[in-house]
């Protein structure tokens, strides 16, 4: 709702007030009923700050409660009026401490006056309400009430204002009520209109009341304030007002002019509008106290006042029309209070107070007319005002809650911080106090022990003195000397103890000062940090502002650039349009030229079609000639085939004879192989290569004879070692002529000249690539078929001679190889050892693969079957036991195949195999780490009777002596075995060997893999050990750290410069500390005592004759130095401890030295002297 509209409505109302001269009569009761139905009154909470009446119950807040939000200073003689509730329609039950609102005469300037129905007043009343119209001013509160009798039942509509008939009826039925006034020890006031205030101003109290004066008069008219005070109505609530007496009739009250009322309403309207715009409530009473009449209507133009005359009322009236001041009469005589009641003869004025001020002028008794239009405007304005007040109240309450909540959170955080700081200081002081008490108790105990020892020595001296009397004077002198020495020692010892106690006290004082300084320093650092953060925030704010300024400047620059670019683009587009126009004209000219070229192409196409027709005719003629030529060639080929079949029969006979000779050669070679196997050198690779090549050549000799078509001499020469098959030259005149088909090549189809040139080039390249041919004497077929020496064919003799020569040459070569292998020169010996190492690698890999296959086929797969069928095993346990066995088996299979391939080739190269597989060997890490974990599970499996039977059956089926445990440990041992075998091969491989680099890199890779596996295994074991110790040691600190690992443990005795850290302990030695524990028989095996750090420690060997070592933590010149002397069970343990300590502390620059006991004593004395100084 716009506030300007509301202000315009106010101006219209003022104009109507000036123009109205006569007001019509209005039925106030029916209008009030309609208003109550349309706008039911909300049930707001009522706070009763007055003292409780004699019959009322105790309120929640008490008589002295003051709302802290609106509390202001108040005098001892006056207080804010208390709101009261009365239901005029029903007259229902009332609670204690609530009063009827129509118990006083409020004389203000009413815009509307209405009649209220008091007929339905048959309801019961609770305490605090009375049946008579009497008011008793007690020491605690003022109580008011009405008579609930049914004599007040006449409706306002039957009231005759001219004849006062209603008055006469009431005069006959109801006696005149009287008001008894007594002196109030505590002046209290009741705000009768606060219940009808707008929602935004509900429960708000104005305590800026003016001090009231007691006077004999019992009625005050606050409308005369304008005569005594300034016209500014804000000062009306700030300066004390002088009460004035009113006459017995309502006509004697002073009135204010309509002009003053309109001015006041305008000023208050403008002020409230200003506060509404600013979002803050006004400090003036017009903003905080919005008093409304009983039907919550806004001020309207002046209407005549409805007055009900009570013949029995007295001549005095008590008027309640000011929310901030209330007068209470104090007089020895009885005074009558005029109530707005039909039975009353006095004048009662009902005012309707608004939020812009009060018009306290009275009207004539006879004017009761009202304009119907003004009431419709009044209801509309009332709705607007209610909506505005509700909205304002919600916003104000929300802001107040947020403000209070922020302060509450701040105070809570501040209190928590102070409590935390106080708690830390108390804890520090408590620790210091406990430490001092412990130290003083320890010193007292030591002194008591020393006194007991001195007493024992005195007793011993007395006994010795008694015995010495018998011996003589010499013994007496000796005893005296001993006594003096003891006394002297006692005095020295006492001095030493006192010095130590003084030292401890000094140390404690120094520690306290250090703690205080540390706390002060910490607070200073925190303040500096806060200041720094504040500076940073300021600098960030400045930087942000500068950045915004820069961004704004850059944005402007960019906009200017964009404008320039747009101009350039427009210019470019214009130029582009010109270019497009030029291109368009050019394209039109090109189109004309293209049309001409199309016509020329059409003419050329027609000429080409004519030429193609002529060529087709020529091709058909050429095809016919080719068909005739093919027929002729087919006849020639058939004749040649017949002749070839005859020749093949002859060649078959010749091949059979050669097979018999080859069989003889194979038998001889088998004998030689058997002999070589029986020799001392077994499985030599060069020999195997040579034999395999001979066998292969012998097997391939018949096929080569067939391929060369009876070229016997050439096939025999091809069987020689280290010779390739020879293709004889065609120009040779000594080649046998097998058939005319081969001698005379068949006619071929004519080929284009380009293909013929390509074939010739290929033949020339083949001839260039061929090796030089060994010239072998050849014979013609006639010469070979000749019979010599009666029964032998010349060709057969030639063949036998050639075979014999080859056999002799081969035998000679074998003898040379044997001699070379049996020789003892270093080179041969090195080659032999290398071959043995390679062969061992292959044989062990083969055996390892066989073991993995047995483990898979006879244990892993059957166990999975049993787990599914008989539930003898669990699938989870099987997977844990065998881990990644399948992956390892696959790798071993591939390595075995590759080794077999490489061993069949000379020279043997195996290094690249392991270089290739080295990264894959990391899968062994999972198997190795899992092996120790599954050992207990596997043991439990084997101990089960059914499982034990299963494992024995599978072992018998596998026909292997090894059990499952031996098979499972093989993958763990395989990687170290690779390293040993490759190291042996590298040892026997010379640097100039082809395989040296690969073997070396393979050995280094496998070595790194083994180191990686061992490190991972060590980390897993160390973590398991740390977890075990964490569980065993009670109250132990956090042991599991990434850099920490366990070294050893031992029982020992410790002597330290702190007596509480001395005694017999059990030590756990880690790489960075020594954990001191004691054995315990309760919930854990060990109990944590303290820790000896090794970071800045110095390890010393006291003597070589004992089993003690000393650990010094810190510098000897420092006060906080710690010295621990550890006595180990034996010298052997001492040596092992020193060795481990030297290994763990050497990288940190700490050396372990050997010092004699005298040197250590001297250093301890120097340390004690430095402390005394």
From Swiss-Prot:
SUPFAM superfamilies to which the protein is assigned, alphabetical: DBL homology domain (DH-domain), PH domain-like
**Skewed-composition ranges (Basic and acidic residues):** 262-277, 470-479
Does this UniProt record's set of keywords contain Metal-binding? no
Annotated region described as Disordered, given as residue ranges: 1-380, 458-479, 712-765
Q: Which CDD domains match?
A: RhoGEF
Q: Which SMART domains does this chain map to?
A: PH, RhoGEF
Q: What is this protein called?
A: Rac guanine nucleotide exchange factor JJ
Q: Where is the composition biased (Polar residues)?
A: 50-62, 119-133, 220-239, 280-295
* An example Gene Ontology CC term for this record: cytoplasm
């Amino acid at each position: 709702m716009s506030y300007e509209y509301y202000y315009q409505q106010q101006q219209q109302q003022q104009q109507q007030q000036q123009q109205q001269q006569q007001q019509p009569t209005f039925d106030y009761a029916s209008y009030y009923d309609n208003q109550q139905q349309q706008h039911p009154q909300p049930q707001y909470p009522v706070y009763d700050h007055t003292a409780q009446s004699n019959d009322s119950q105790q309120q929640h807040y008490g008589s002295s409660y003051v709302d802290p939000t609106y509390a202001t200073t108040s005098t001892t003689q006056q207080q804010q009026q208390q709101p009261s509730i009365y239901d005029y329609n029903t007259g229902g039950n009332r609670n204690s401490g609530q009063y009827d609102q129509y118990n006083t005469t409020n004389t203000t300037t009413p815009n509307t006056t209405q009649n209220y129905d008091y007929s339905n007043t048959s309801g019961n009343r609770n305490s605090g309400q009375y049946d008579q119209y009497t008011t008793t001013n007690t020491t605690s509160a003022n109580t008011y009430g009405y008579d609930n009798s049914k004599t007040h039942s006449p409706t306002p509509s039957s009231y005759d204002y001219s004849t006062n008939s209603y008055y006469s009826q009431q005069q006959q039925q109801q006696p005149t009520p009287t008001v008894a006034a007594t002196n109030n020890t505590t002046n209290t006031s009741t705000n009768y209109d606060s219940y009808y205030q707008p929602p935004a101003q509900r429960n708000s109290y104005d305590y800026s009341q003016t001090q009231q004066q007691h006077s004999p008069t019992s009625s005050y008219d606050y409308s005369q304030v304008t005569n005594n005070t300034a016209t500014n109505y804000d000062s009306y609530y700030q300066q004390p007002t002088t009460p004035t007496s009113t006459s017995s009739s309502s006509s004697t009250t002073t009135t204010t002019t309509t002009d003053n009322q309109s001015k006041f309403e305008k000023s208050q309207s403008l002020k409230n509008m200003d506060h509404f715009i600013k979002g803050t409530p006004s400090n003036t009473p017009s903003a905080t106290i919005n008093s409304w009449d009983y039907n919550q209507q806004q001020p309207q133009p002046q209407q005549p006042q409805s007055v009900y005359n009570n013949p029995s009322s007295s001549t005095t009236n008590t008027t309640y029309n000011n929310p901030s001041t209330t007068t209470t009469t104090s007089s020895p005589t009885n005074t009558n209070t005029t109530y707005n009641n039909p039975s009353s003869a006095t004048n009662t004025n009902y005012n309707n107070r608004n939020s812009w001020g009060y018009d306290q002028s009275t009207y004539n008794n006879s004017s009761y007319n009202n304009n119907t239009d003004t009431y419709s405007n009044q209801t509309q304005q009332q709705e607007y005002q209610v909506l505005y007040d509700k909205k304002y109240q919600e916003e104000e309450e929300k802001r107040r809650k947020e403000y209070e909540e922020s302060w509450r959170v701040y105070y809570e955080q501040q209190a928590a911080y102070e409590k935390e700081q106080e708690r830390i200081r108390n804890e520090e002081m408590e620790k210091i106090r406990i430490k001092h008490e412990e130290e003083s108790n320890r010193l007292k105990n030591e002194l008591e022990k020393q006194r007991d020892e001195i007493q024992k020595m005195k007793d011993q001296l007395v006994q010795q003195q008694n015995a010495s009397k018998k011996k003589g004077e010499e013994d007496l002198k000796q005893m005296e000397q001993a006594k003096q020495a003891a006394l002297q020692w006692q005095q020295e010892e006492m001095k030493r103890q006192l010095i130590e106690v003084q030292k401890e006290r000094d140390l404690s004082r120094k520690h306290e000062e250090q703690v205080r300084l540390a706390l002060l320093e910490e607070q200073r650092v925190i303040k500096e940090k806060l200041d720094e953060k504040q500076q940073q925030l300021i600098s960030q704010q400045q930087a942000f502002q500068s950045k915004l300024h820069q961004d704004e400047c850059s944005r402007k620059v960019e906009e200017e650039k964009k404008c320039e670019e747009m101009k350039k683009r427009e210019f470019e587009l214009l130029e582009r349009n010109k270019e497009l126009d030029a291109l368009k004209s050019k394209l039109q000219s090109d189109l004309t030229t293209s049309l001409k070229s199309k016509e020329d192409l059409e003419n050329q196409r027609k000429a080409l079609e004519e030429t193609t027709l002529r060529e087709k005719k020529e091709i058909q003629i050429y095809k016919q000639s080719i068909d005739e030529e093919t027929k002729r060639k087919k006849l020639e080929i058939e004749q040649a085939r017949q002749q070839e079949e005859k020749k093949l029969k002859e060649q078959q006979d010749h091949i059979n004879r050669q097979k018999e000779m080859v069989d003889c050669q194979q038998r001889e070679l088998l004998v030689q192989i058997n002999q070589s196997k029986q020799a001392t050198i077994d499985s030599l690779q060069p020999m195997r290569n040579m034999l395999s090549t001979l066998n292969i050549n012998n097997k391939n000799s018949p096929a080569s004879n067939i391929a060369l078509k009876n070229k016997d001499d050439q096939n025999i020469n091809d069987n020689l070692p280290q010779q390739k098959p020879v293709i004889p030259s065609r120009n040779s005149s000594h080649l046998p002529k097998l058939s005319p088909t081969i001698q005379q090549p068949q006619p071929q189809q004519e080929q284009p000249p380009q293909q013929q040139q390509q074939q010739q080039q290929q033949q020339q390249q083949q001839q260039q690539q061929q090796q030089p041919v060994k010239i072998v004497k050849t014979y013609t077929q006639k010469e070979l078929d000749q019979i010599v020496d009666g029964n032998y064919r010349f060709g057969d003799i030639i063949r036998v001679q050639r075979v014999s020569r080859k056999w002799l040459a081969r035998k000679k070569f074998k003898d040379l190889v044997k001699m070379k292998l049996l020789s003892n020169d270093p080179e041969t010996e090195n080659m032999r050892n290398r071959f043995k190492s390679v062969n061992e690698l292959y044989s062990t890999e083969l055996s390892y693969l066989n073991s993995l296959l047995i483990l898979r086929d006879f244990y892993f797969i059957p166990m999975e079957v049993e787990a599914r069928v008989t539930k003898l095993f669990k699938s989870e346990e099987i997977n844990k036991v065998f881990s990644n066995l399948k992956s390892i088996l696959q790798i071993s299979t591939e390595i075995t195949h590759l080794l077999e391939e490489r061993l069949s080739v000379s020279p043997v190269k195996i290094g690249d195999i392991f270089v290739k597989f080295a990264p894959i060997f990391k899968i062994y890490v999972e198997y190795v780490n899992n092996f120790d974990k599954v050992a207990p599970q596997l043991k439990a499996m084997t101990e089960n009777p059914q499982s034990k039977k299963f494992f024995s059956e599978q072992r018998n089926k596998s026909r292997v002596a090894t059990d499952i445990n031996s098979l499972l440990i093989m993958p763990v041992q395989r990687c170290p075995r690779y390293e040993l075998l490759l190291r042996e091969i590298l040892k026997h491989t010379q640097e100039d060997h082809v395989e040296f680099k690969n073997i070396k890199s393979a050995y280094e890779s496998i070595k790194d893999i083994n180191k990686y596996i061992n490190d991972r295994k060590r980390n897993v074991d160390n973590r398991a050990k740390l977890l075990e110790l964490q569980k065993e040691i009670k109250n132990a600190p956090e042991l599991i750290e990434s850099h920490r690992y366990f070294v050893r443990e031992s029982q020992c005795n410790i002597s330290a410069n702190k007596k509480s850290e001395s005694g017999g302990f059990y030590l756990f030695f880690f790489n960075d500390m020594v954990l001191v524990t004691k054995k315990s028989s309760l919930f854990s095996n060990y109990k944590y005592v303290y820790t000896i750090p090794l970071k800045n420690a110095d390890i010393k060997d006291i003597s070589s004759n004992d089993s003690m070592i000393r650990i010094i933590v810190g510098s000897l010149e420092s006060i906080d130095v710690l010295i621990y002397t550890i006595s180990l069970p034996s010298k052997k343990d001492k040596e092992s401890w020193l060795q481990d300590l030297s290994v763990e502390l050497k990288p940190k620059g700490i050396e372990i030295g050997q010092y004699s006991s005298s040197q250590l004593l001297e250093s301890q004395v120097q340390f004690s002297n430095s402390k005394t100084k």
